[in-house]
């Protein structure tokens, strides 16, 4: 009789996700994962044909985690793109390893684009572009691209430790960017 598997696919993905959050996506190895999951490498390779298949599931878990992070982020600003930017910068500060995985690392062709990740299932970007258009912005899509370059740059600076603005300063700058870019 075959021995019952004592570790599940979800437990393996959760362990790999923890490694990613703490050390980075590139640090996932079968041995390190086995230690984190509390098993040998055998169950990992019984469930996954290779580490790349596992890493796809970790990426999907990170993408879902970002969507949950954005959904729970307090949104209280009337100025379009401000809450979107504040959430993105906050995620970069709080979860730098996950931010690197989702928004800075190259991925396979079937991975989600940055736009798809940020837009999410709630159409966050689409909604903000609509909101900007309703407020009288002549070209809200172009405005989004301009302000997104600033938002992404600020988030990258947060990951590298070069972003020292507090919440209120970040808020003021995002509002100012919107006003300046909207013309």
State each model region's role:
Residues 20, 53-62, 69, 102, ...:
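Alpha-helical DNA-contacting segments of helix-turn-helix folds
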Residues 28-35, 44:
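Append "Primarily bacterial transcriptional regulators
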Residues 109-135, 141-145, 172-183:
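Amphipathic alpha-helical packing segments from all-alpha helical-bundle domains
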Residues 57, 71-97, 143, 147:
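Hydrophobic alpha-helical connector segments
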Residues 101, 148-166, 180-183:
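Amphipathic C-terminal alpha-helical segment
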Residues 1-23, 32, 36, 53:
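Basic, helix-initiating cap at the start of DNA-binding domains
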Residues 56, 60-83, 123-131:
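Amphipathic alpha-helical linker/stalk segments
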Residues 12, 27, 50-58:
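Short amphipathic alpha-helical segment with a characteristic S/N-K-E followed by hydrophobic residues
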């Amino acid at each position: 009789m075959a021995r019952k598997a004592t570790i599940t696919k979800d437990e393996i993905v959760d362990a790999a996700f923890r490694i990613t959050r703490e050390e980075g996506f590139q640090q996932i190895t079968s041995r390190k994962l086995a230690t984190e999951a509390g098993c040998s490498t055998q169950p990992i390779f019984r469930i996954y044909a290779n580490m790349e298949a596992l890493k796809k599931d970790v990426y999907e878990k990170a993408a879902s985690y970002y969507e949950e992070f954005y959904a729970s982020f307090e949104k209280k600003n009337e100025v379009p793109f401000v809450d979107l930017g504040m959430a993105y910068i906050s995620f970069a500060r709080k979860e730098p390893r996950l931010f690197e995985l989702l928004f800075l690392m190259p991925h396979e062709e079937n991975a989600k684009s940055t736009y798809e990740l940020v837009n999410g299932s709630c159409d966050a970007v689409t909604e903000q572009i609509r909101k900007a258009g309703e407020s009288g912005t002549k070209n809200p899509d172009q405005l989004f691209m301009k302000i997104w370059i600033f938002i992404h740059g600020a988030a990258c600076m947060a990951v590298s430790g070069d972003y020292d603005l507090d919440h209120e300063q970040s808020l003021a700058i995002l509002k100012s960017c919107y006003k300046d870019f909207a013309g």
